[in-house]
From Swiss-Prot:
Protein name: Protein TORMOZ EMBRYO DEFECTIVE
The keyword Repeat appears for this protein: yes
Chief location of this protein within or outside the cell: nucleus
Organism field: Arabidopsis thaliana
Keyword Nucleus: yes
GO cellular component: nucleolus; small-subunit processome
Basic residues compositional bias, start-end: 849-864
Organism lineage: Eukaryota, Viridiplantae, Streptophyta, Embryophyta, Tracheophyta
Tissue expression profile of the protein: Preferentially expressed in dividing cells in a variety of tissues and meristematic regions.
Length: 876
């Protein structure tokens, strides 16, 4: 068999991060994206795969309200700081902002024209703003509580605004009224608790208001009277109406026909949907207040009574066209309901689930032979199964009473995908992932079940390790994988394996051995099925977090809190290799590439790729901001998944082959471009050559080209032409190159010349827009000042030399006159005079004793000069 090629690099292909932290959200008009508040940032999330398309950074202000313009080009936000901001979704920049309320803004609505924005505040006020000008156009007061719901009437002829408040009232405001007393058209008082949501019928004639008093009131907007009150017997958080002409409307009409037993549905009927604390979707008919549909059970999984606060929906919205219904849960999940036509009937099903926040990731494993799904155990009582392609939550396995700590997966002989989970409730559960049901429950442990593992060959058992220090083998014989009710699992054998908690278990690929790693800093190997002790692996200085058998060799790998990974011989328990490189505890390690390599992750947030034979760390990846607790490796695809305390799930793909192809392609392209550059230089096409040199990132070649241009007669025109063809990014590179050239005296003249021409071409407004220009100029200024001072000294010295040579009659005065104009000679004399004046001042400041010594030196020099002159005369 041909050996597998070693992997050299992995790339993070997909990430699932927190994109919604509860609070406000808004759906685009076409349903393609959702703007979600996540702390002080706004995430624009693709509704198909939960990927974050863009992020709008806030200003450390917790967001309380969001709204979109009708054309989805502008996003409005407000927070606790009372600042209202308008964002351009194309540039992600704040185009204007203002303050108006005396308290946080709790709700927002944009007019159909896009020119007006209504805000509802905790200060009991309702304000209307001009979007372009940012000034207040209407000011409404009257509510006696926090105003939380607000909407414009869709009919522009009516020009009214509707608001709902915690004072249990709904008010209708006239935007055309000039008299203050006539601004409030109606006060609708039928609720006995806070109004949480308001909605309008499609014809705009009926208003629906839902409240925490467990009723929905229907209001006639002709006379503002209450047409009906619908008792729902649950605290309501949202009410929305069903639009006609959609598959959802057809589904509701068919329900109406079955309920009323009529051949045709009532065309005049209005249908509305309510959601609330029970976590079920209910569809109502306004005429007669009839409940046409109610979910049999909630899709929100809450296993304990203490978690009732997480049950229920907090908001709902009808999506455009055939996208269905969107409901938001209290635990930051988005449920997408759609209509599905079956053979017997049409049903409302949960088609998609986007999880806004996963909490801490404890464990994860790939599902099935094709590894299209990923089972994830978070800091919850449930296991979430994600579609790897879209990273949307396909389904949830709920049944444990406390947090799930560990899991493992396998494919049974019948082809069903099985999942085993261990929890803090001291039980293990066996799940059929195909039917999404629990088929077995195992009890008997007296501590948290920290590790579970399936058999690798026969799939007839699984093992579990617990905080009670025992290792158990559970039998799967006789278990029906299609059972509707879970049965009690039985143990084959049990042993007190360690002196402290068992953190990890692993089964050998031939099902003959099982290895355990413990808090007592040792790992033990046991013979199956009777759990006879084989050998103890001693050598780690801290607790062991992970153990795994090699797929090809008779060895086992352990990862420990002492920052090392060790490989041990099974035969005698000796340590074969020790791998060091992590800066903190190593939490997981797993073999890849048929045991010739392995990956490890740790509390330092790093993922490392190792070669076993060379003990070399090939690559290190930093994509987590907290401990990486979970590591899953695909057996078929060898795709890697990591999850950590930062609630982030990263998917990694082997990019060795693609990187090699990219490097070859880049090298080939660089050769071709390099030849093109040389041809351009030979043809004296300097503009093209400089452009190519920038593209190839060759600063030395750029310098040679500019240096050659400076020696040309038409250098000014050529350099200006070359600089005008550069882009903004290339100008940034040019400034970087000039900064480096400017530090060297031999290159500074060209650097200063290019810099001078660049400043003449680029206006200051464009120079400021160059990325990092401030730092670049800071590096240019000191050396430029130094070069200027040096050249200035040379110029001054040259004038002194000319004067001296002229006085000594070395230079013909007439030549000096012709070479230097009168003004230049005047400058020269001024310089000499200034220097003589400086010399006189220096003499005056010198102590008398030094002046005497200078005079004596002057006399001796004069005598020496006289003697030399006499000697020369005698010689003549």
């Amino acid at each position: 068999m041909a050996p597998h090629s070693l992997k050299k690099n992995y790339r993070c292909s997909r990430s699932l991060k927190q994109f919604y932290g509860g609070g406000p959200f808004i759906v685009s008009s076409d349903g393609s994206f959702i703007a979600c508040a996540c702390g002080d940032v706004i995430n624009i999330v693709d509704s198909t795969d939960s990927s974050v398309k863009s992020t709008i950074e806030g200003e450390s202000d917790t967001l309380t309200a969001l709204a979109l313009s009708p054309d989805d080009k502008l996003l409005f936000s407000a927070g606790h700081s009372r600042q209202i901001r308008v964002w351009d979704l194309e540039t992600l920049k704040c185009i204007r902002s203002w303050k108006g309320h005396e308290g946080p803004v709790m709700g927002m609505a944009c007019h159909a024209s896009g020119g007006l924005l209504a805000t509802a505040g905790a200060d009991r006020k309702v304000l209307v703003w001009d979007v372009d000008g940012g000034f207040c156009t209407h000011y409404f007061r009257g509510h006696k509580g926090v105003v939380s719901s607000i909407l414009f009437h869709p009919d522009s002829n009516k020009n009214i605004l509707i608001s709902g408040s915690d004072d249990a009232t709904v008010r209708v405001w006239d935007l055309n009224a000039k008299n203050t007393e006539k601004k409030c058209l109606a006060i609708m008082e039928k609720h006995f608790s806070a109004v949480t949501s308001i909605a309008l019928s499609e014809d705009g004639l009926t208003l629906f208001s839902a409240g925490r008093d467990k009723v929905v009131n229907l209001w006639d907007l002709h006379d503002y009277s209450c047409k009906a009150t619908v008792a729902t017997y649950e605290v309501l958080e949202a009410v929305t109406t069903v639009s006609s002409g959609t598959p959802f409307a057809s589904f509701v009409a068919s329900l109406d026909q079955k309920k009323s037993k009529k051949k045709e549905s009532d065309s005049q009927a209005t249908y509305f949907i309510t959601v609330g604390e029970r976590g079920v979707v209910r569809i109502w008919k306004s005429e007669g207040s009839i409940c046409l549909y109610e979910q049999k059970s909630s899709d929100i999984t809450v296993s304990s009574d203490d978690e009732e606060s997480k049950r229920g929906f907090t908001a709902a919205a009808m999506l455009p066209s055939d996208h269905g219904l969107l409901c938001v849960t209290a635990d930051q999940q988005f449920f997408f309901y759609s209509v599905v036509e079956n053979v017997e009937e049409t049903e409302l099903v949960l088609s998609k689930r986007l999880v806004g926040y996963n909490e801490e990731i404890a464990d994860m494993k790939f599902l099935g032979d094709e590894e299209q799904f990923l089972a994830v155990a978070t800091n919850l009582e449930e296991v979430r199964v994600y579609d790897v392609a879209t990273m949307s939550c396909s389904y949830v396995l709920a049944g444990h009473k406390e947090v799930v700590l560990s899991l493992d997966t396998c494919v049974s002989s019948s082809g069903n995908v099985l999942i085993v989970t261990g929890s803090k409730d001291k039980t293990v559960r066996l799940w059929n992932a195909t039917s999404k049901s629990c088929i077995g429950v195992g009890t008997g442990h007296n501590g948290d079940i920290l590790a579970v593992a399936f058999a690798k060959k026969s799939f007839s058992f699984f093992v579990s390790g617990s905080g009670d220090r025992t290792l158990k083998v559970w039998s799967l014989d006789g278990i029906s994988e299609d059972s509707e009710e879970p049965i009690n699992l039985k143990t084959r054998s049990v042993v007190a394996a360690h002196d402290k908690d068992i953190n990890s278990v692993a089964v050998a690929r031939n099902d003959s051995l099982v290895c355990t790693g413990s808090e007592d800093r040792t790992a033990s190997i046991w013979r199956l099925p009777d759990l006879v002790h084989v050998v103890t692996l001693k050598g780690h200085k801290r607790r062991i977090f992970s153990v795994e058998f090699s797929t090809v060799d008779q060895c086992v790998m352990t990862a420990s809190g002492d920052k090392t990974v060790k490989i041990w011989a099974i035969s005698d328990g000796s340590c074969l290799k020790t791998f060091e490189g992590h800066t903190s505890s190593v939490l997981r390690a797993s073999f890849i590439t048929d045991g010739t390599q392995f990956v490890s992750c740790g509390a330092d947030g790093l993922l490392k790729l190792w070669n076993v034979n060379t003990s070399e760390c090939i690559a290190t990846y930093d994509q987590h901001e907290d401990k990486v607790w979970a590591l899953a490796v695909g057996k078929k695809t060898e795709m890697i998944a990591t999850g950590g305390g930062d609630a982030v799930i990263n998917l990694w793909h082997d990019s060795t082959a693609s990187d090699k192809e990219d490097d070859f392609r880049k090298e080939e392209e660089a050769i071709l471009r390099g030849q093109e550059l040389e041809n351009a230089v030979l043809d004296a096409e300097y503009t093209k050559a400089i452009r190519l040199a920038f593209e190839l990132c060759r600063p030395h070649k750029v310098f040679e080209l500019f240096s050659g241009l400076c020696r040309k007669r038409d250098s000014d025109e050529q350099i200006v032409k070359a600089l005008q063809g550069l882009e903004k990014e290339e100008f940034r590179l040019l400034f970087e190159y000039v900064r480096e050239w400017n530090t060297k005296p031999k290159l500074c003249h060209i650097a200063q010349f290019v810099l001078y021409k660049t400043f003449n071409i680029l206006p200051p407004t464009e120079i400021v827009q160059v990325k990092g220009i401030g730092e670049l100029l800071e590096g240019l200024i000191p050396y430029s000042q130094r070069h200027f001072s040096r050249i200035d000294r040379f110029v001054r010295s040259s004038f002194l030399l000319d004067y001296t040579l002229g006085e000594m009659s070395v230079i013909d005065p007439e030549t000096v006159e012709t070479e230097y104009p009168k003004d230049e000679k005047k400058k020269e004399k001024d310089v000499i005079a200034a220097m003589e004046q400086d010399t006189d001042e220096l003499k005056q400041e010198t102590p008398s004793r030094k002046r005497k010594s200078q005079k004596s030196k002057g006399k001796s020099n004069k005598k020496r000069l006289i003697a030399e002159a006499q000697g020369s005369v005698i010689a003549v």
